[in-house]
Amino acid sequence: EENFNNLYAYPNPVHPTYRGHITIKGLMVDTQVRILDAAGNLVKILEGQGGAAVWDGNNERGQRVASGVYTAVCNTKSGESHNSVKILIMN
């Protein structure tokens, strides 16, 4: 991708019975994805590969995150481009 115009996450919303990976697609080359909770706290850092990043729905300690809206903030490592997508987790 040359920009983040096609950025999306799936599945979204994430239903209580789903325990698979959440995929963030439409990333540019060399993108870091920071997952933030509704209060803006850092939950997880992901590295984009092949235009996508995969989140297991867990925080950095390996614990499943609480229900709520999370924001995947996507930044190129050069800092030139950024965008975000919201993900609803229902547990």
Predicted regions and their residues:
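Glycine-centered coil/turn sites that cap beta-strands in beta-rich domains
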Residues: 1-34, 52, 80
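Short, acidic, Ser/Thr-enriched surface-loop or helix-capping motifs
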Residues: 37-38, 59-60, 76
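Short beta-strand segments within Ig-like beta-sandwich modules, predominantly Fibronectin type-III
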Residues: 45-50
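Signal that preferentially marks extracellular ectodomain short beta-strand elements
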Residues: 52-65
